[in-house]
């Protein structure tokens, strides 16, 4: 490609506070339209905002986790524009004094590490939502102000990404971090984590950025990548034809995989920012910052490294387990009761994840098999009470019923047979019924050994101890 792609991202994360940023209304998703509003949300004359302290705390968390410096004197500003879902005629945000600045995240892609700068993180309120009626013959749009005044952090990256894959790697890492911090539920479909992408092209070798287009409010990683890829092609075609890219805001259409013009792109001065006279500056002390720093959870990258260094887990296992804070906690809780890291990892990534996926993609928090129950099952397998194959059957029953593994094994008579006399009798019966195959095996066709093992296990209904079966069967066939 003769053009260098330049991408910067603006990510809006909706915070998991119970109430809004400047009033006491609920932030619960899915309520009846306009049922979670008050004079502040509605922008009524004389209504005064009161800052939610937890929003500031969450912003400090986000800043520390993304290597930002924390601004100790914070000022809120009014961002002035007119839109039907913005009843006040302005949005309360931050302008020249954002709460977090000069951070970075490191991404890993194809074995290489790259640092993506974070320009700023600032606190702001969300706007309402326009609902377009899907009724034949009705062209009206409705306004739902439940979302108005909901707390957001806007996380603005430097234009450091040079491909759609780098953008997605950065987004996924940021998504993982805000969920680990517990400040955002990360739900892209509900708009809790949404992204605007600024995309431009410049000639290879140049250090002067091209004219950018902003792609608005894209709510899935797949669509973000598609939107950026399309925009790169669109701009390259314009430049190849000798045209000029217009600075504008564009909307992505997931049905066609294309973007379309929405409006001309505004500059900061178009919003006529000025300090909000109804909100005093917020002073963040060193003690407050250090307290929040001390309460930060172990973040994904550190957890992944610890799983590999202290528990000797393979990189793949560590990556999968550390991807979700809840999954990692489930693994660690099980490991605390059954300290065999690789065995626990195999079961969590295998049977546990499979069962949850098959059950309408339930979350690990909803898993009916608790870490304690899973540890009990693994102990039965370790003691030789049940085989690995039977353990999977027992797990499925545990998932369905929530019963303890010991009870299921007892009720269904699944105790593993290790009695050498009983196993020898089964082996003798199998060899007698398959005399022809025995002759072939002894004639050099040793691949038949697995066939004999399978026949013995079938005769025992899966209860025979595989280790004992293998050892005794080998002696019989060699003798």
Curated annotation (Swiss-Prot):
<dbReference type="InterPro" id="IPR003789">
    <property type="entry name" value="Asn/Gln_tRNA_amidoTrase-B-like"/>
</dbReference>
<dbReference type="InterPro" id="IPR017959">
    <property type="entry name" value="Asn/Gln-tRNA_amidoTrfase_suB/E"/>
</dbReference>
<keyword id="KW-0547">Nucleotide-binding</keyword>
<protein>
    <recommendedName>
        <fullName>Aspartyl/glutamyl-tRNA(Asn/Gln) amidotransferase subunit B</fullName>
        <ecNumber>6.3.5.-</ecNumber>
    </recommendedName>
</protein>
<dbReference type="InterPro" id="IPR004413">
    <property type="entry name" value="GatB"/>
</dbReference>
<dbReference type="InterPro" id="IPR023168">
    <property type="entry name" value="GatB_Yqey_C_2"/>
</dbReference>
<dbReference type="Pfam" id="PF02934">
    <property type="entry name" value="GatB_N"/>
</dbReference>
<dbReference type="GO" id="GO:0050567">
    <property type="term" value="F:glutaminyl-tRNA synthase (glutamine-hydrolyzing) activity"/>
</dbReference>
<dbReference type="InterPro" id="IPR006075">
    <property type="entry name" value="Asn/Gln-tRNA_Trfase_suB/E_cat"/>
</dbReference>
<dbReference type="GO" id="GO:0005524">
    <property type="term" value="F:ATP binding"/>
</dbReference>
<comment type="similarity">
    <text>Belongs to the GatB/GatE family. GatB subfamily.</text>
</comment>
<keyword id="KW-0648">Protein biosynthesis</keyword>
<dbReference type="GO" id="GO:0006412">
    <property type="term" value="P:translation"/>
</dbReference>
<comment type="function">
    <text>Allows the formation of correctly charged Asn-tRNA(Asn) or Gln-tRNA(Gln) through the transamidation of misacylated Asp-tRNA(Asn) or Glu-tRNA(Gln) in organisms which lack either or both of asparaginyl-tRNA or glutaminyl-tRNA synthetases. The reaction takes place in the presence of glutamine and ATP through an activated phospho-Asp-tRNA(Asn) or phospho-Glu-tRNA(Gln).</text>
</comment>
<dbReference type="InterPro" id="IPR014746">
    <property type="entry name" value="Gln_synth/guanido_kin_cat_dom"/>
</dbReference>
<keyword id="KW-0436">Ligase</keyword>
<dbReference type="GO" id="GO:0050566">
    <property type="term" value="F:asparaginyl-tRNA synthase (glutamine-hydrolyzing) activity"/>
</dbReference>
<dbReference type="InterPro" id="IPR018027">
    <property type="entry name" value="Asn/Gln_amidotransferase"/>
</dbReference>
<dbReference type="Pfam" id="PF02637">
    <property type="entry name" value="GatB_Yqey"/>
</dbReference>
<dbReference type="InterPro" id="IPR017958">
    <property type="entry name" value="Gln-tRNA_amidoTrfase_suB_CS"/>
</dbReference>
<dbReference type="InterPro" id="IPR042114">
    <property type="entry name" value="GatB_C_1"/>
</dbReference>
<dbReference type="GO" id="GO:0070681">
    <property type="term" value="P:glutaminyl-tRNAGln biosynthesis via transamidation"/>
</dbReference>
<comment type="subunit">
    <text>Heterotrimer of A, B and C subunits.</text>
</comment>
<keyword id="KW-0067">ATP-binding</keyword>
């Amino acid at each position: 490609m003769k053009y260098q792609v330049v991408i910067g991202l603006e990510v809006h994360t909706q915070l998991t506070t119970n109430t809004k940023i400047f009033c006491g209304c609920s932030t619960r998703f899915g309520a009846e339209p306009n049922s979670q509003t008050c004079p502040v949300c509605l922008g009524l004359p004389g209504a005064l905002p009161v800052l939610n302290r937890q929003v500031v705390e969450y912003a400090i968390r986000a800043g520390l986790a993304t290597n930002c410096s924390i601004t100790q004197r914070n000022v809120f500003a009014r961002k002035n524009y007119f839109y039907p879902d913005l009843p006040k005629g302005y949005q309360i945000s931050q302008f020249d004094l954002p709460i977090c600045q000069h951070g970075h995240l490191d991404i890993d892609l194809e074995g290489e590490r790259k640092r993506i700068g974070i320009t700023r993180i600032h606190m702001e309120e969300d706007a309402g939502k326009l609902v377009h009626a899907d009724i034949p013959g009705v062209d009206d749009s409705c306004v739902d102000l439940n979302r108005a005044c909901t707390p957001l952090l806007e996380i603005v990256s430097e234009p450091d990404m040079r491909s759609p894959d780098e953008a997605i790697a950065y987004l996924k890492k940021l998504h993982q971090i805000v969920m680990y911090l517990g400040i955002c539920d990360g739900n892209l479909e509900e708009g809790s984590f949404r992204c605007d992408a600024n995309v431009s092209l410049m000639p290879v070798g140049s250090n002067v950025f091209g004219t950018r287009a902003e792609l608005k409010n894209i709510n899935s990683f797949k669509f973000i990548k598609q939107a950026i890829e399309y925009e790169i092609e669109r701009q390259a075609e314009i430049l190849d034809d000798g045209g000029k890219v217009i600075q504008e805001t564009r909307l992505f259409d997931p049905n066609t995989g294309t973007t379309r013009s929405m409006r001309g792109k505004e500059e900061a001065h178009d919003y006529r920012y000025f300090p909000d006279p109804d909100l005093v500056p917020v002073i963040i002390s060193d003690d407050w910052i250090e307290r929040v720093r001390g309460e930060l959870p172990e973040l994904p990258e550190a957890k992944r490294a610890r799983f590999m260094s202290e528990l000797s887990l393979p990189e793949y296992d560590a990556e999968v387990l550390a991807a979700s804070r809840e999954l990692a906690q489930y693994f660690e809780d099980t490991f605390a009761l059954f300290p065999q890291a690789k065995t626990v990892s195999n079961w969590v990534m295998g049977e546990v994840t499979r069962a949850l996926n098959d059950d309408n993609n339930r979350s690990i928090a909803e898993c009916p098999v608790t870490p304690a129950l899973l540890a009990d099952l693994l102990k039965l397998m370790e003691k030789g009470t049940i085989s690995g194959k039977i353990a999977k059957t027992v797990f499925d029953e545990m998932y369905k019923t929530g019963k303890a593994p010991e009870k299921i094994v007892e009720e269904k008579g699944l105790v593993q047979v290790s009695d050498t006399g009983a196993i020898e009798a089964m082996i003798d019966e199998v060899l007698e019924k398959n005399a022809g195959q025995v002759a072939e095996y002894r004639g050099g066709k040793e691949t038949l050994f697995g066939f004999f093992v399978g026949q013995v296990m079938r005769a025992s209904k899966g209860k025979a101890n595989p280790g004992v079966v293998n050892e005794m069967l080998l002696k019989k066939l060699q003798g």
